[in-house]
């Protein structure tokens, strides 16, 4: 999972993720937006599920983050889409709507994001 942190002209931090992990970048860009308390909540959530089979969820405006002791899933809060509505020969692209990664990798990303924000 590769990522890059950038600042736009307004100073807002932008996260760019490698292919297959785009939804994680969108989660940072849309739900975190530099608010370190969101990251603290997620880290607390990760600690709360450690050593258990429980899951922890944070529903945001655009994306929902779901984690367990091993994995993180970020999914867009879009309305369900039925393929019956598509015209023949068309397909629905949702690669940027759902991403999975290991919990340890995600927590490392959270730590690096926080460091980038603070420096």
Swiss-Prot record:
UniProt cross-references to Pfam families, sorted A to Z: UPF0231 (PF06062)
Chain ranges passing through the membrane: none
InterPro entries according to UniProt: UPF0231
Membership in a protein family: Belongs to the UPF0231 family.
Protein name: UPF0231 protein ECA3777
């Amino acid at each position: 999972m590769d990522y890059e942190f950038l600042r736009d002209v307004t100073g807002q931090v932008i996260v760019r993720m490698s292919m297959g992990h785009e939804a994680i970048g969108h989660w940072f860009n849309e739900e975190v937006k530099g608010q370190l308390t969101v990251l603290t909540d997620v880290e607390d959530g990760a600690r709360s599920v450690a050593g258990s089979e429980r899951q922890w969820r944070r529903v945001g405006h655009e994306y929902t983050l779901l984690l367990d002791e091993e994995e993180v899933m970020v999914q867009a809060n879009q309305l369900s889409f039925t393929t019956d509505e598509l015209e023949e020969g068309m397909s629905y692209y949702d690669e940027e709507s759902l991403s999975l990664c290991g919990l340890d990798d995600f927590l490392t990303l959270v730590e690096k994001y926080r460091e980038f924000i603070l420096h």
